[in-house]
């Protein structure tokens, strides 16, 4: 089984350093099509069974209403499952760009068994769960701040301990080359 996980940064193109981010910052308001096409070409070449997509635009003004998960699913022949990354009671869902920010998983099953859960802390709380290829695949995007990220990790460890089927936890863990990452 081949799995790919990619933070696509809303299809804005990945800046190479903070100076480049300043020059390309306008892409966060109107994403060019080229980076998303390049991501699709990459996935076509790799041919993964499961694709986890973080920072996916689900149809905001930035993409002229285009759902990036649907576009990449069309390019790969996989089925998209996507959810908004903020909890249903989040005030961010009332804002045009934020209400269309999500995460997605692309799988071969035509009617995948999927669910959205939410961590109890942080801004990005989504825990996207999909059963595919004989496993339960969890996709998360952890907090930027260390204390909140640690709370999320503890919550995930406790919550996923009860999962009795084979599983994979994947995502953007925002570790920034930390040397004190603990494995258990």
What residues fall within each predicted segment?
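Active-site flanking residues adjacent to catalytic metal/cofactor-binding acidic residues
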Residues: 6, 54, 140, 170-172
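Structured beta-strand-rich core segments of catalytic domains in phosphoester-bond hydrolases
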Residues: 55-134
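Membrane-proximal envelope and lipid/glycan-remodeling enzymes
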Residues: 11-17, 138-140, 148, 159, ...
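Metal-dependent phosphoesterases centered on the DNase I-like endonuclease/exonuclease/phosphatase
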Residues: 146-184
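Alpha-helix termination/capping residues and helix-transition junctions
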Residues: 45-47, 134, 161
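N-terminal, active-site-proximal structural segment of metallo-dependent hydrolase catalytic domains
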Residues: 1-75, 82-90
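Surface-exposed cleft-lining segments at the edges of enzyme active sites
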Residues: 22-29, 56-58, 115-118, 138-147
